[in-house]
């Protein structure tokens, strides 16, 4: 039986920035986590690390892969979306792209 790979993260999508009718707040991103469909399920992910992994054209310290880190702050709505705050705001071109929600730090 072949060994299966184990992920330390859950896939998620970057939906939007937090916004009102006229004002956009790019410091807070709305993230939809796969398999998370209620506010109660979203509670598990509060405080977890989230990252956006992307590739650049120029290598820095031998790697073209870069990461923007953030933290899950609170639930957003009743359908399992969460709000995340990143160290550097995500660019708007990441709307719809994949994020990784790490399963650490654990609060179990």
Swiss-Prot record:
Chief place of localization? cytoplasm
Q: Which GO terms describe its biological process?
A: cytoplasmic translation; ribosomal large subunit biogenesis
PROSITE patterns named among the record's database cross-references: RIBOSOMAL_L35AE
UniProt keywords (A-Z) are: Cytoplasm, Phosphoprotein, Ribonucleoprotein, Ribosomal protein
Quick check: keyword Cytoplasm in the entry?
yes
Q: Which SUPFAM superfamilies match?
A: Translation proteins (SSF50447)
Q: Which Pfam families match?
A: Ribosomal_L35Ae
| GO molecular function, a single term | structural constituent of ribosome
The record's subcellular location field reads: Cytoplasm
Top-level taxon of the source organism: Eukaryota
Q: List modified residues, type Phosphoserine.
A: 98
An annotated GO cellular component of this protein is: cytosolic large ribosomal subunit
Q: How does it assemble?
A: Component of the large ribosomal subunit (LSU). Mature yeast ribosomes consist of a small (40S) and a large (60S) subunit. The 40S small subunit contains 1 molecule of ribosomal RNA (18S rRNA) and at least 33 different proteins. The large 60S subunit contains 3 rRNA molecules (25S, 5.8S and 5S rRNA) and at least 46 different proteins.
Comment field (misc):
There are 2 genes for eL33 in S.pombe.
Functional summary from the UniProt entry: Component of the ribosome, a large ribonucleoprotein complex responsible for the synthesis of proteins in the cell. The small ribosomal subunit (SSU) binds messenger RNAs (mRNAs) and translates the encoded message by selecting cognate aminoacyl-transfer RNA (tRNA) molecules. The large subunit (LSU) contains the ribosomal catalytic site termed the peptidyl transferase center (PTC), which catalyzes the formation of peptide bonds, thereby polymerizing the amino acids delivered by tRNAs into a polypeptide chain.
Question: Which family is annotated?
Answer: Belongs to the eukaryotic ribosomal protein eL33 family.
Instruction: Tell me the protein's name.
Output: Large ribosomal subunit protein eL33B
What is the species of this protein? Schizosaccharomyces pombe (strain 972 / ATCC 24843) (Fission yeast)
């Amino acid at each position: 039986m072949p060994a299966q790979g184990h992920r330390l993260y859950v896939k998620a999508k970057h939906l939007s920035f937090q916004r009102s009718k006229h004002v956009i707040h790019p410091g807070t991103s709305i993230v939809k986590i796969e398999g998370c469909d209620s506010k109660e399920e979203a509670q598990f992910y509060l405080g977890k690390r989230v990252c956006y992994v992307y590739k650049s054209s120029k290598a820095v310290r031998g790697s073209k892969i870069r990461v923007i880190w953030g933290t899950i702050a609170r639930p957003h709505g009743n359908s399992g979306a969460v709000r995340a705050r990143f160290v550097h705001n995500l660019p708007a071109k990441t709307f719809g792209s994949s994020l990784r929600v790490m399963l650490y730090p654990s609060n179990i």
